[in-house]
Amino acid sequence: MTEHWENLNALTAPLLTWYDLNGRTLPWRSVVTPYRTWVSEIMLQQTRVSAVIPYFERFMAELPDAAALATVPEERLLKLWEGLGYYSRARNLQKAAKVIVSDFGGELPRTCASLKTLPGIGDYTAAAIASINFGEPVAAVDGNLLRVAARVSGCADDIMDAKVRKQFTAHLNDAIDLARPGAYNQAMMDLGATVCLPNGAPKCEICPARMMCEAYKNGLTEILPVRAKKKARKIEERTVLLLFQNSKAALRKRADTGLLASLWEFPSVLGNLDEAGVSLALAQMGLSAQTVEPTGSAKHIFTHIEWDMKGYFADVTGENDDLFWADAAAFDAAAIPTAFKKFAALVRARLQ
Protein backbone atom coordinates (compact mmCIF):
# COMPACT_ATOMS: atom_id res chain seq x y z
CA MET A 1 0.00 0.00 0.00
CA THR A 2 1.33 3.42 -0.95
CA GLU A 3 1.78 5.89 1.89
CA HIS A 4 0.10 9.26 1.50
CA TRP A 5 2.08 11.48 3.82
CA GLU A 6 0.52 14.56 2.25
CA ASN A 7 -2.67 13.62 4.11
CA LEU A 8 -1.00 14.69 7.35
CA ASN A 9 -0.47 18.18 5.97
CA ALA A 10 -4.07 18.32 4.78
CA LEU A 11 -5.26 17.31 8.25
CA THR A 12 -3.61 20.19 10.14
CA ALA A 13 -6.24 22.91 9.60
CA PRO A 14 -9.36 20.79 10.22
CA LEU A 15 -7.61 19.16 13.17
CA LEU A 16 -7.07 22.50 14.91
CA THR A 17 -10.66 23.55 14.19
CA TRP A 18 -11.83 20.30 15.76
CA TYR A 19 -9.53 20.80 18.74
CA ASP A 20 -10.79 24.31 19.43
CA LEU A 21 -14.28 22.84 19.80
CA ASN A 22 -13.51 19.45 21.34
CA GLY A 23 -10.19 19.64 23.20
CA ARG A 24 -10.15 18.04 26.62
CA THR A 25 -10.34 20.22 29.72
CA LEU A 26 -7.40 19.15 31.88
CA PRO A 27 -5.84 20.78 34.97
CA TRP A 28 -2.41 21.20 33.35
CA ARG A 29 -4.07 23.02 30.47
CA SER A 30 -6.16 25.39 32.60
CA VAL A 31 -3.00 26.93 34.06
CA VAL A 32 -0.09 26.41 31.66
CA THR A 33 3.50 26.63 32.86
CA PRO A 34 6.57 24.68 31.76
CA TYR A 35 6.78 23.04 35.19
CA ARG A 36 3.14 21.90 35.15
CA THR A 37 3.44 20.60 31.60
CA TRP A 38 6.60 18.70 32.52
CA VAL A 39 5.15 17.05 35.62
CA SER A 40 1.93 16.13 33.82
CA GLU A 41 3.75 14.57 30.88
CA ILE A 42 5.94 12.47 33.17
CA MET A 43 2.89 11.31 35.13
CA LEU A 44 1.02 10.46 31.93
CA GLN A 45 3.70 8.01 30.81
CA GLN A 46 2.17 4.52 31.13
CA THR A 47 -0.78 5.97 33.10
CA ARG A 48 -4.35 6.91 32.12
CA VAL A 49 -5.38 10.58 32.19
CA SER A 50 -8.26 9.94 34.60
CA ALA A 51 -5.88 8.26 37.05
CA VAL A 52 -3.29 11.04 36.79
CA ILE A 53 -5.56 14.03 37.52
CA PRO A 54 -5.90 13.62 41.33
CA TYR A 55 -2.19 12.80 41.66
CA PHE A 56 -1.26 15.86 39.63
CA GLU A 57 -3.43 18.17 41.70
CA ARG A 58 -2.08 16.80 44.98
CA PHE A 59 1.51 17.02 43.69
CA MET A 60 1.08 20.64 42.58
CA ALA A 61 -0.47 21.64 45.89
CA GLU A 62 2.58 20.38 47.79
CA LEU A 63 5.35 20.87 45.20
CA PRO A 64 4.33 23.89 43.08
CA ASP A 65 7.72 24.55 41.49
CA ALA A 66 11.13 23.07 40.73
CA ALA A 67 12.65 24.44 43.93
CA ALA A 68 10.10 22.63 46.09
CA LEU A 69 10.56 19.42 44.10
CA ALA A 70 14.34 19.63 44.36
CA THR A 71 14.29 19.78 48.16
CA VAL A 72 11.44 17.45 49.16
CA PRO A 73 12.65 14.34 51.06
CA GLU A 74 12.65 11.30 48.79
CA GLU A 75 10.41 9.33 51.14
CA ARG A 76 7.75 12.06 50.88
CA LEU A 77 8.17 12.30 47.11
CA LEU A 78 7.62 8.56 46.73
CA LYS A 79 4.58 8.77 49.01
CA LEU A 80 3.08 11.47 46.77
CA TRP A 81 3.78 9.18 43.81
CA GLU A 82 2.40 6.08 45.52
CA GLY A 83 -0.08 4.35 43.22
CA LEU A 84 1.23 5.80 39.95
CA GLY A 85 3.91 3.13 39.59
CA TYR A 86 7.14 3.34 37.60
CA TYR A 87 8.79 5.12 40.51
CA SER A 88 11.97 5.89 38.58
CA ARG A 89 9.89 8.65 36.98
CA ALA A 90 9.58 10.41 40.34
CA ARG A 91 13.27 10.03 41.10
CA ASN A 92 14.23 11.42 37.69
CA LEU A 93 11.86 14.35 38.23
CA GLN A 94 13.75 15.25 41.38
CA LYS A 95 17.16 14.75 39.75
CA ALA A 96 16.10 17.08 36.94
CA ALA A 97 14.64 19.61 39.38
CA LYS A 98 17.98 19.84 41.16
CA VAL A 99 19.70 20.57 37.83
CA ILE A 100 17.04 23.13 36.93
CA VAL A 101 17.62 24.93 40.24
CA SER A 102 21.42 24.77 40.12
CA ASP A 103 22.00 25.40 36.40
CA PHE A 104 18.91 27.19 35.07
CA GLY A 105 17.83 29.51 37.87
CA GLY A 106 14.84 27.38 38.81
CA GLU A 107 13.17 27.64 35.39
CA LEU A 108 13.04 24.90 32.76
CA PRO A 109 15.26 25.49 29.71
CA ARG A 110 13.38 26.81 26.69
CA THR A 111 14.45 24.56 23.81
CA CYS A 112 13.81 20.94 22.97
CA ALA A 113 17.54 20.24 22.71
CA SER A 114 18.36 21.71 26.11
CA LEU A 115 15.38 20.02 27.78
CA LYS A 116 16.70 16.65 26.63
CA THR A 117 19.85 17.18 28.69
CA LEU A 118 17.79 16.79 31.87
CA PRO A 119 17.39 13.39 33.58
CA GLY A 120 14.23 11.55 32.54
CA ILE A 121 13.33 13.87 29.65
CA GLY A 122 13.40 12.18 26.26
CA ASP A 123 12.33 13.20 22.78
CA TYR A 124 8.58 13.14 23.42
CA THR A 125 8.53 15.00 26.74
CA ALA A 126 11.01 17.61 25.53
CA ALA A 127 8.94 18.23 22.40
CA ALA A 128 5.72 18.52 24.42
CA ILE A 129 7.21 21.09 26.82
CA ALA A 130 8.99 23.07 24.09
CA SER A 131 5.97 23.23 21.78
CA ILE A 132 3.27 23.90 24.38
CA ASN A 133 5.20 26.44 26.46
CA PHE A 134 7.79 27.98 24.15
CA GLY A 135 6.23 27.66 20.69
CA GLU A 136 8.96 25.46 19.22
CA PRO A 137 7.54 23.68 16.12
CA VAL A 138 8.51 20.11 17.00
CA ALA A 139 6.15 17.13 17.03
CA ALA A 140 5.66 15.29 20.34
CA VAL A 141 5.47 11.78 18.95
CA ASP A 142 3.83 9.23 21.24
CA GLY A 143 1.54 6.26 20.66
CA ASN A 144 -1.45 8.48 19.93
CA LEU A 145 0.35 10.47 17.23
CA LEU A 146 1.80 7.31 15.68
CA ARG A 147 -1.62 5.67 15.51
CA VAL A 148 -3.28 8.70 13.93
CA ALA A 149 -0.42 9.22 11.48
CA ALA A 150 -0.29 5.55 10.47
CA ARG A 151 -4.01 5.44 9.74
CA VAL A 152 -4.19 8.79 7.98
CA SER A 153 -1.14 8.12 5.80
CA GLY A 154 -1.81 4.42 5.28
CA CYS A 155 1.72 3.49 6.38
CA ALA A 156 1.87 -0.24 7.15
CA ASP A 157 5.40 -0.31 8.57
CA ASP A 158 6.00 -1.46 12.15
CA ILE A 159 5.65 1.60 14.40
CA MET A 160 7.80 -0.09 17.04
CA ASP A 161 10.81 0.05 14.71
CA ALA A 162 13.11 2.99 15.51
CA LYS A 163 13.72 3.82 11.84
CA VAL A 164 10.00 3.89 11.16
CA ARG A 165 9.38 6.16 14.16
CA LYS A 166 12.06 8.50 12.84
CA GLN A 167 10.25 8.60 9.50
CA PHE A 168 6.93 9.37 11.19
CA THR A 169 8.56 12.12 13.25
CA ALA A 170 9.96 13.80 10.15
CA HIS A 171 6.56 13.84 8.44
CA LEU A 172 4.77 15.08 11.57
CA ASN A 173 7.34 17.85 11.96
CA ASP A 174 6.58 18.83 8.38
CA ALA A 175 2.83 18.90 9.07
CA ILE A 176 2.92 20.77 12.39
CA ASP A 177 1.27 24.18 12.51
CA LEU A 178 4.07 26.73 12.88
CA ALA A 179 1.84 29.29 14.58
CA ARG A 180 0.29 26.83 17.07
CA PRO A 181 2.67 23.90 17.54
CA GLY A 182 1.54 23.22 21.10
CA ALA A 183 -2.11 23.16 20.08
CA TYR A 184 -1.23 20.84 17.17
CA ASN A 185 0.44 18.33 19.47
CA GLN A 186 -2.37 18.48 22.01
CA ALA A 187 -4.94 18.14 19.23
CA MET A 188 -3.25 15.02 17.88
CA MET A 189 -3.02 13.61 21.42
CA ASP A 190 -6.71 14.26 22.02
CA LEU A 191 -7.73 12.86 18.64
CA GLY A 192 -5.84 9.65 19.37
CA ALA A 193 -7.13 9.42 22.93
CA THR A 194 -10.82 10.12 22.26
CA VAL A 195 -11.59 9.39 18.59
CA CYS A 196 -8.87 7.48 16.73
CA LEU A 197 -8.90 4.76 19.36
CA PRO A 198 -6.66 1.68 19.41
CA ASN A 199 -7.58 -1.97 18.95
CA GLY A 200 -9.84 -1.49 15.95
CA ALA A 201 -12.35 0.72 17.75
CA PRO A 202 -12.01 4.22 16.21
CA LYS A 203 -14.99 6.58 16.09
CA CYS A 204 -14.55 7.37 12.40
CA GLU A 205 -17.99 8.93 12.06
CA ILE A 206 -16.95 11.94 14.17
CA CYS A 207 -13.30 12.16 13.11
CA PRO A 208 -12.03 15.31 11.36
CA ALA A 209 -9.54 13.13 9.45
CA ARG A 210 -12.19 10.83 7.99
CA MET A 211 -12.24 12.20 4.43
CA MET A 212 -8.43 12.04 4.07
CA CYS A 213 -7.76 8.88 6.09
CA GLU A 214 -6.33 5.97 4.10
CA ALA A 215 -7.26 3.43 6.78
CA TYR A 216 -10.89 4.59 6.75
CA LYS A 217 -11.13 4.70 2.96
CA ASN A 218 -9.61 1.23 2.57
CA GLY A 219 -11.20 -0.53 5.54
CA LEU A 220 -7.89 -0.89 7.40
CA THR A 221 -8.66 0.66 10.77
CA GLU A 222 -8.46 -2.76 12.45
CA ILE A 223 -5.06 -3.43 10.86
CA LEU A 224 -3.29 -0.08 11.20
CA PRO A 225 -1.08 0.76 12.89
CA VAL A 226 1.15 -2.29 12.51
CA ARG A 227 2.88 -3.12 15.78
CA ALA A 228 5.25 -6.02 16.42
CA LYS A 229 3.97 -8.44 19.04
CA LYS A 230 5.47 -8.09 22.49
CA LYS A 231 7.20 -10.96 24.21
CA ALA A 232 5.00 -12.85 26.67
CA ARG A 233 5.36 -11.70 30.26
CA LYS A 234 7.11 -13.94 32.74
CA ILE A 235 4.72 -15.13 35.47
CA GLU A 236 6.18 -15.23 38.98
CA GLU A 237 4.39 -16.79 41.95
CA ARG A 238 5.04 -15.10 45.29
CA THR A 239 3.84 -15.64 48.84
CA VAL A 240 3.38 -12.33 50.68
CA LEU A 241 3.84 -12.36 54.46
CA LEU A 242 1.76 -9.89 56.48
CA LEU A 243 3.58 -10.13 59.79
CA PHE A 244 2.49 -8.63 63.12
CA GLN A 245 4.31 -8.20 66.41
CA ASN A 246 3.34 -5.96 69.34
CA SER A 247 0.60 -4.20 67.33
CA LYS A 248 3.04 -3.35 64.55
CA ALA A 249 3.36 -4.65 60.98
CA ALA A 250 6.56 -5.71 59.24
CA LEU A 251 7.86 -3.80 56.23
CA ARG A 252 11.04 -4.35 54.29
CA LYS A 253 12.96 -1.86 52.14
CA ARG A 254 13.60 -3.01 48.59
CA ALA A 255 17.03 -2.72 46.99
CA ASP A 256 18.26 0.69 45.79
CA THR A 257 18.20 -0.46 42.15
CA GLY A 258 15.88 -2.53 40.01
CA LEU A 259 12.12 -3.07 40.15
CA LEU A 260 10.38 -0.87 42.75
CA ALA A 261 13.76 0.38 43.98
CA SER A 262 13.92 1.77 47.55
CA LEU A 263 10.19 1.33 48.19
CA TRP A 264 8.69 -0.43 51.18
CA GLU A 265 7.21 -3.87 50.69
CA PHE A 266 5.87 -6.74 52.72
CA PRO A 267 8.31 -9.61 53.18
CA SER A 268 7.71 -12.22 50.50
CA VAL A 269 9.18 -15.43 49.16
CA LEU A 270 9.05 -17.02 45.74
CA GLY A 271 6.53 -19.80 45.25
CA ASN A 272 2.97 -20.57 46.27
CA LEU A 273 3.36 -21.75 49.87
CA ASP A 274 0.86 -23.44 52.14
CA GLU A 275 0.63 -22.69 55.87
CA ALA A 276 3.34 -25.18 56.77
CA GLY A 277 5.59 -23.65 54.11
CA VAL A 278 4.98 -20.19 55.55
CA SER A 279 5.99 -21.35 59.03
CA LEU A 280 9.18 -22.85 57.61
CA ALA A 281 9.98 -19.67 55.64
CA LEU A 282 9.50 -17.60 58.79
CA ALA A 283 11.79 -19.91 60.75
CA GLN A 284 14.47 -19.36 58.11
CA MET A 285 14.04 -15.62 58.73
CA GLY A 286 14.60 -16.11 62.48
CA LEU A 287 10.92 -15.71 63.32
CA SER A 288 8.50 -18.05 65.02
CA ALA A 289 4.91 -18.16 63.80
CA GLN A 290 2.27 -18.09 66.53
CA THR A 291 -0.63 -18.00 64.07
CA VAL A 292 -0.81 -18.30 60.27
CA GLU A 293 -3.97 -17.33 58.39
CA PRO A 294 -4.53 -17.06 54.60
CA THR A 295 -5.72 -13.63 53.41
CA GLY A 296 -6.50 -14.29 49.76
CA SER A 297 -4.65 -13.61 46.53
CA ALA A 298 -3.76 -10.70 44.26
CA LYS A 299 -2.20 -10.16 40.87
CA HIS A 300 -0.09 -7.30 39.56
CA ILE A 301 1.16 -6.82 36.01
CA PHE A 302 4.40 -4.98 35.32
CA THR A 303 5.71 -4.30 31.82
CA HIS A 304 7.68 -7.53 31.51
CA ILE A 305 6.60 -9.61 34.50
CA GLU A 306 3.40 -10.63 36.27
CA TRP A 307 3.21 -11.35 39.99
CA ASP A 308 0.63 -13.91 41.13
CA MET A 309 0.55 -13.40 44.89
CA LYS A 310 -0.92 -15.33 47.79
CA GLY A 311 -1.02 -13.64 51.19
CA TYR A 312 -0.90 -14.79 54.80
CA PHE A 313 -1.40 -13.04 58.11
CA ALA A 314 1.06 -14.24 60.75
CA ASP A 315 1.61 -13.22 64.35
CA VAL A 316 5.29 -13.78 65.04
CA THR A 317 7.98 -13.53 67.67
CA GLY A 318 11.69 -13.10 67.09
CA GLU A 319 13.91 -10.55 65.37
CA ASN A 320 15.11 -9.95 61.83
CA ASP A 321 17.37 -7.00 61.03
CA ASP A 322 15.89 -6.57 57.53
CA LEU A 323 12.43 -5.79 58.90
CA PHE A 324 11.01 -2.47 60.06
CA TRP A 325 8.09 -2.74 62.45
CA ALA A 326 5.60 0.02 61.64
CA ASP A 327 2.77 1.29 63.78
CA ALA A 328 -0.30 2.79 62.10
CA ALA A 329 1.26 6.25 61.64
CA ALA A 330 4.53 4.93 60.24
CA PHE A 331 2.68 2.54 57.97
CA ASP A 332 0.56 5.34 56.51
CA ALA A 333 3.69 7.43 55.87
CA ALA A 334 5.52 4.64 54.05
CA ALA A 335 5.57 4.53 50.24
CA ILE A 336 4.19 1.08 49.38
CA PRO A 337 3.84 0.04 45.71
CA THR A 338 0.43 -0.45 44.12
CA ALA A 339 1.37 -4.10 43.60
CA PHE A 340 0.62 -4.60 47.30
CA LYS A 341 -2.50 -2.41 47.41
CA LYS A 342 -4.88 -5.21 48.45
CA PHE A 343 -2.56 -6.45 51.17
CA ALA A 344 -1.81 -2.92 52.39
CA ALA A 345 -5.52 -2.31 52.94
CA LEU A 346 -5.78 -5.48 55.03
CA VAL A 347 -2.78 -4.51 57.15
CA ARG A 348 -3.99 -0.93 57.59
CA ALA A 349 -7.37 -2.17 58.82
CA ARG A 350 -5.71 -4.45 61.36
CA LEU A 351 -3.43 -1.69 62.65
CA GLN A 352 -6.29 0.72 63.37
Predicted regions and their residues:
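Catalytic cores of DNA base-excision repair glycosylases
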Residues: 3-9, 13-205, 209-222, 287-288
